[in-house]
């Protein structure tokens, strides 16, 4: 799952739990401005490649911890979504952490 796929599945589940007939699109797009939430970390200025990769690493590390926790929850559907997302996010964490180490080592 990419981030859009993860969000879509979580919002679909939220709509089912809510029980008011709203699908993922209704939950995602049809709300007041103050109801929108996001991770402020990803709003930081891009900066150079090192800044970008460190920010990506921090985001990936948080995502892995979140999905690990949700993968062991009692709600079967949420647990399944989290397990699938965790697999992909571990790949992203490995990729970004390799870049952080590479950039941290510098050049000779």
For each of these PLM feature ranges, what is it?
Residues 77-108:
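A contiguous pocket-lining binding segment that forms or flanks enzyme active sites
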Residues 2-30, 96-101:
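Conserved alpha-helical segments that form or flank metal/cofactor-binding pockets of metalloenzymes
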Residues 6, 10, 59-66, 92-96:
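Amphipathic, well-ordered alpha-helical segments in soluble domains
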Residues 1, 45-73:
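Alpha-helical bundle segments that constitute or directly flank the non-heme di-iron/ferroxidase center
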Residues 2-5, 55, 84-91:
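DHp/HisKA dimerization-phosphoacceptor four-helix bundle of two-component histidine kinases
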């Amino acid at each position: 799952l990419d981030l859009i796929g993860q969000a879509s599945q979580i919002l679909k589940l939220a709509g089912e739990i809510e029980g008011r007939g709203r699908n993922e699109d209704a939950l995602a797009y049809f709300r007041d401005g103050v109801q929108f939430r996001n991770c402020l970390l990803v709003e930081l200025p891009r900066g150079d490649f090192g800044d970008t990769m460190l920010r990506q690493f921090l985001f990936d590390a948080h995502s892995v911890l979140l999905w690990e926790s949700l993968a062991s929850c009692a709600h079967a559907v949420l647990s399944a979504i989290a397990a699938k997302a965790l697999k992909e996010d571990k790949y992203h964490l490995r990729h970004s952490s390799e870049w952080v180490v590479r950039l941290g080592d510098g050049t000779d």
